[in-house]
C-alpha cells in the first residue's frame, strides 16, 4: 500500500489581489462523485462569482486528475492547481 499526502479536513482561505477576491476550498474525498458534489455545493454558495475554478486529484496513485478553467484562458487556472497538488503529492 502506497503512502500519500491528503487533506486532513475541510478548510478554506481567502485573499484579495488588486480588487479581485480569491477563495480556495479543500475537502478530503475518496471518489469523483464526492468531489463533484462538493464542487456543486461551492458553486451554489458562490453562484454570483465570475469564475469557479474546480480541480481534483483522486486515487492513491493520483489516477484521476481533472480541472476546469471556467471561462478563464485555457490552462491558466485549473491546470496550475492540479500541478501544484501533484507536485506536492496531495491526493483525495
Task: Pin down the residues of each PLM region.
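Active-site beta-strand/loop microenvironment that shapes enzyme catalytic pockets
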Residues: 83-92
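N-terminal cationic and glycine-rich segments that engage phosphates or anionic surfaces
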Residues: 78
Amino acid at each position: 500500500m502506497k503512502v500519500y499526502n491528503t487533506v486532513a479536513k475541510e478548510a478554506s482561505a481567502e485573499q484579495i489581489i488588486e480588487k479581485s477576491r480569491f477563495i480556495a476550498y479543500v475537502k478530503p474525498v475518496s471518489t469523483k462523485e464526492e468531489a463533484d458534489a462538493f464542487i456543486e455545493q461551492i458553486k451554489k454558495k458562490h453562484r454570483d462569482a465570475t469564475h469557479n475554478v474546480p480541480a481534483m486529484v483522486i486515487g492513491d496513485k493520483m489516477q484521476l486528475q481533472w480541472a476546469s478553467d471556467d471561462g478563464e484562458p485555457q490552462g491558466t487556472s485549473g491546470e496550475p492547481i492540479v500541478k501544484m497538488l501533484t507536485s506536492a503529492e496531495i491526493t483525495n
